[in-house]
Curated annotation (Swiss-Prot):
Motif (Nuclear localization signal): 101-105
Protein name: Matrix protein 1
Location in the cell: Virion membrane; Host nucleus
Membrane-topology descriptor: Peripheral membrane protein
Organism in which the protein naturally occurs: Influenza A virus (strain A/Swine/Wisconsin/1/1967 H1N1)
Keyword Membrane: yes
Length: 252
């Protein structure tokens, strides 16, 4: 796996699923391929994106700044600086300085990532802030190692929290989660269907599913009534794709 592929993988792992994730993935691909060279416009676009947490925006801003060639005097962005200040905790800053000194001795991406993984996400973000604010310099490869270690820490905690929700025995939470998943699947179906004639059927199924979820929420239904909703939708989507000549076995 190439270095940039690895960086893209780690960074996207902390971005919530949805149309915005696809957009960010495209931007990262363009940046890494050298197709997008306007850092100013890129940062302005990133700053105004909804849904993303300040830290995620900070990490993406850091990656864009590392990758896109820019004039030396280009102003650092406040939204990135604020996100990478380790919550203003002096403890994080102390650890960040220690980590920075260790990173200075590293020359490889994997070496830097290994060193960084033993620190908390707050200290890692502060260390990124040091480099972003030009208080310290490391090679791009080492900086990417730091980015990936930070994303791994964040993705780990997100995964734990997600697993807790998926394995919860509370029927109300499970019910709501199934309805949310069915709703987002329906939305994705509508987007994929496009405007072809054969799409009418898929659109109809998606629309009915969304109306059903809306009705279930309005009148309040038994928690088990949502079981299988998303799977039914995905089966419909696969059947539609088969007719369109598209075979995607790994949807579930």
């Amino acid at each position: 796996m190439s270095l940039l592929t690895e960086v893209e993988t780690y960074v996207l792992s902390i971005v919530p699923s949805g149309p915005l994730k696809a957009e960010i993935a495209q931007r990262l691909e363009d940046v890494f391929a050298g197709k997008n060279t306007d850092l100013e416009a890129l940062m302005e676009w990133l700053k105004t994106r909804p849904i993303l947490s300040p830290l995620t925006k900070g990490i993406l801003g850091f990656v864009f700044t590392l990758t896109v060639p820019s004039e030396r005097g280009l102003q650092r962005r406040r939204f990135v600086q604020n996100a990478l200040n380790g919550n203003g905790d002096p403890n994080n800053m102390d650890k960040a300085v220690k980590l920075y000194r260790k990173l200075k001795r590293e020359i490889t991406f994997h070496g830097a990532k290994e060193v960084a993984l033993s620190y908390s996400a707050g200290a890692l973000a502060s260390c990124m802030g040091l480099i972003y604010n030009r208080m310290g310099t490391v090679t791009t490869e080492v900086a990417f190692g730091l980015v990936c270690a930070t994303c791994e820490q964040i993705a780990d905690s997100q995964h734990r929290s997600h697993r807790q929700m998926v394995t919860t025995t509370n029927p109300l939470i499970r019910h709501e989660n199934r309805m949310v998943l069915a709703s987002t699947t329906a939305k994705a179906m509508e987007q994929m269907a496009g405007s072809s004639e054969q799409a009418a059927e898929a659109m109809e199924v998606a629309s009915q599913a969304r109306q059903m979820v809306q009705a279930m929420r309005t009148i309040g239904t038994h928690p088990s009534s949502s079981a299988g909703l998303k799977d039914d939708l995905l089966e419909n989507l696969q059947a539609y794709q088969k007719r369109m000549g598209v075979q995607m076995q790994r949807f579930k």
